[in-house]
């Protein structure tokens, strides 16, 4: 899976947001408000865009490596729910 458009994650006065950038900005108008974990997912998906995407399993592994104090099942559940929202908004491609 991969993002349908390139996105930039920014911290604006403590509020983490993501916006489409470059040529892709015409595909998505608006801004996503994110928590830290969702921002990490966007960043992972952005990095894997040029490689053709990343599998759900590898995305979750990457998150579990960063968030070692968190329950692996909760990480996977959060990732699944967030990716489902991205899919519903047309921001995720398989």
What are these regions (language model features)?
Residues 30-94:
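Long, charge-rich, low-complexity alpha-helical segments
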Residues 1-48, 88:
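Acidic, low-complexity/disordered tracts enriched in E/D and polar residues
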């Amino acid at each position: 899976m991969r993002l349908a458009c390139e996105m930039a994650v920014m911290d604006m006065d403590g509020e983490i947001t993501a916006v489409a950038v470059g040529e892709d900005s015409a595909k998505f108008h608006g801004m996503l408000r994110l928590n830290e974990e969702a921002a990490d997912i966007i960043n992972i998906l952005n990095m894997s865009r040029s490689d053709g995407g990343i599998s759900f399993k590898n995305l979750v592994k990457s998150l579990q490596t960063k968030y070692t104090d968190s329950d692996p099942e909760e990480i996977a559940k959060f990732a699944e729910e967030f990716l489902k929202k991205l899919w519903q908004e047309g921001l995720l491609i398989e």
